[in-house]
């Protein structure tokens, strides 16, 4: 084809293009509408409109300019438009589109931001939800009715026994970093305060960790982290701080549930199936030991079912997860997660370097379901007595290890080894210390932790004989009464 011919075709094409009518495109129109309502150069909160009352379960969120606060749109509600109404957290504005009659811009519809993968979740109410968004939608409706919202307790349907699917994260080189990035926003730092008898001011007494299990502020931690008549302050990864109240506590399981009232919805962790965990699998422990937030340790699982009897807990029905992931003071209550980011345990106990234990997630799930059932029936937890000790019976192996580490360890063949005294507790007030050995309570010999538990349960006043190094001490303690 000649040059003149090509030039003629090009000219005809340009003329046809110029004669075509402009066709409005939704996203192009939406883009022009955003240009027509630019954000201010400087934010002046005094010029923000009065915030209307938001729908139940929805908190105010920053507008698209990050200046004023507006009511977010819930799932299925309109978003975008001339003023760019945002969606609630974890929702996105998308199709179907419609035109905003007030400004000519295009309105979208808020929908679930999660993908289809692993969408199905099981709620603490025993119902299977098609996605986290569906559960959140049901919870918003429940709050409007004054009903109790459900907590997501696992991935997959409620009737499923879990899967052994090897997630993609387990095949990546930076799998630890990927897990931490996913899990850390849901891990919280707990700071406990007590009132000084001299100044009558609240001073820090101890710290621990926990993790968020509901978007409205339910947090799981260890029971031994909490003590009676103390202020509990929760600090999120964002730095926001809230005062917490105790909702449920079980000292036998060493599990507790506390509640904060956040300004916005919180990121949650889902419980995996600890029964699916395999020996040799990588795990990651997160927490805030020594008040150092976002502390991460990793290790492998030695056994998934270290029975309480193996630890000398003859009457214990708990099977612990043993790992070499380091769990230090303050790490208690933090999550132990697999490489998919699912909670498979709660950091609980360190016996010695390289030997740590976690309460399995299946126990946590049952604890949450029992709490949910009690709330529905209007039953409050029973009052219990609390001493404030973490202890183990002196087995032969433990006795040999302690004598190897400490030549001054008491020359004793039986008793209960106190590996931690909870600060601010009745035990601490009585003078008990870490690494004491309890050999007698109220004139009765003590050889197992059950002996101590039964003595606390049956008596309002305890006379305790303790071995500390080469000393024999006589202490008295009155257990605390807690809910």
From Swiss-Prot:
Keywords, ordered alphabetically: Disulfide bond, Hydrolase, Protease, Secreted, Serine protease, Signal
S-S bridge residues: 39-65, 43-67, 48-68, 54-71, 79-93, 87-110
Region (Serine protease): 208-368
GO cellular component: extracellular region
GO BP: any one term: proteolysis
Keyword Disulfide bond: yes
Residues at the catalytic site: 224, 254, 332
SUPFAM superfamilies tied to this protein: Growth factor receptor domain (SSF57184), Kazal-type serine protease inhibitors (SSF100895), PDZ domain-like (SSF50156), Trypsin-like serine proteases (SSF50494)
Main location: secreted
PROSITE patterns noted in UniProt: IGFBP_N_2 (PS51323), PDZ (PS50106)
Compartments (UniProt record): Secreted
Keyword field contains RNA-binding: no
Taxonomy, superkingdom: Eukaryota
Pfam family, one: IGFBP
UniProt-listed Enzyme Commission number(s): 3.4.21.-
Domain PDZ: 379-471
SMART domains per UniProt: IB, KAZAL, PDZ
All residue ranges annotated as the IGFBP N-terminal domain in the record: 35-113
Signal peptide (residue range): 1-30
Recorded GO MF terms: identical protein binding; serine-type endopeptidase activity
Family, per entry: Belongs to the peptidase S1C family.
Biological role: Serine protease.
PANTHER family xref list: SERINE PROTEASE FAMILY S1C HTRA-RELATED, SERINE PROTEASE HTRA4
Protein name as it appears in the record: Serine protease HTRA4
């Amino acid at each position: 084809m000649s040059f003149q011919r090509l030039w003629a075709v090009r000219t005809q094409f340009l003329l046809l293009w110029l004669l075509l009518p402009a066709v409005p495109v939704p996203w192009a129109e939406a883009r022009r509408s955003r240009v027509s309502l630019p954000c201010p150069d400087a934010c002046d909160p005094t010029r923000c409109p009065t915030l209307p009352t938001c729908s139940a379960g929805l908190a105010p969120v920053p507008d698209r300019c990050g200046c004023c606060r507006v009511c977010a749109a819930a799932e299925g509600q309109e978003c975008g438009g001339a003023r760019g109404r945002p969606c609630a957290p974890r929702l996105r504005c998308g199709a179907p589109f419609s035109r905003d009659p007030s400004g000519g811009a295009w309105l979208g519809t808020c929908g679930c931001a999660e993908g289809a993968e692993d969408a199905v979740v099981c709620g603490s109410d025993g119902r299977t939800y098609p996605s986290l968004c569906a559960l959140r939608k049901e919870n918003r409706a429940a709050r409007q009715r004054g009903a109790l919202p459900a907590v997501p307790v696992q991935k997959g349907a409620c009737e499923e026994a879990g899967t052994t699917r090897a997630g993609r994260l387990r095949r990546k080189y930076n799998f630890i970093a990927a897990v931490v990035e996913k899990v850390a926003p849901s891990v919280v730092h707990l700071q406990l305060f007590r009132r000084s008898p001299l100044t009558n001011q609240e001073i820090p007494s101890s710290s621990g960790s926990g993790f968020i299990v509901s978007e409205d502020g339910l947090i799981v931690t260890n029971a031994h982290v909490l003590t009676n008549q103390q202020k509990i302050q929760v600090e999120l990864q964002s730095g926001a701080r809230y005062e917490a109240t105790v909702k449920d506590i079980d000292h036998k399981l060493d599990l507790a549930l506390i509640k904060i009232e956040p300004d916005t919805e919180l990121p949650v962790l889902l419980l995996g199936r600890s029964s699916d965990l395999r020996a040799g699998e990588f795990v990651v422990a997160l927490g805030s030991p020594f008040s150092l937030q976002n502390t991460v340790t990793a290790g492998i699982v030695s056994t998934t079912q270290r029975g309480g009897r193996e630890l000398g807990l003859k009457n214990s029905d708990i099977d612990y997860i043993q790992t070499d992931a380091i769990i230090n003071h303050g790490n208690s209550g933090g999550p132990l997660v697999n490489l998919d980011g699912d909670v498979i345990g709660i950091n609980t106990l360190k016996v010695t370097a390289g030997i740590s234990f976690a309460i399995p997630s299946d126990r946590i799930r049952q604890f949450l379901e029992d709490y949910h059932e009690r709330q529905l029936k209007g039953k409050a937890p029973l009052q219990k007595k609390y001493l404030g000790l973490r202890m183990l019976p002196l087995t032969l192996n433990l006795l040999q290890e302690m004598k190897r580490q400490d030549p001054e360890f008491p020359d004793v063949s039986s008793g209960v080894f106190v590996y931690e005294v909870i600060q601010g507790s009745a035990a601490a007030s009585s003078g008990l210390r870490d690494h004491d050995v309890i050999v007698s309570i109220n004139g009765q010999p003590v050889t197992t932790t059950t002996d101590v538990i039964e003595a606390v349960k049956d008596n309002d006043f305890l006379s305790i004989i303790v071995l500390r190094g080469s000393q024999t001490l006589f202490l008295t303690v009155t257990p605390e009464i807690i809910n």
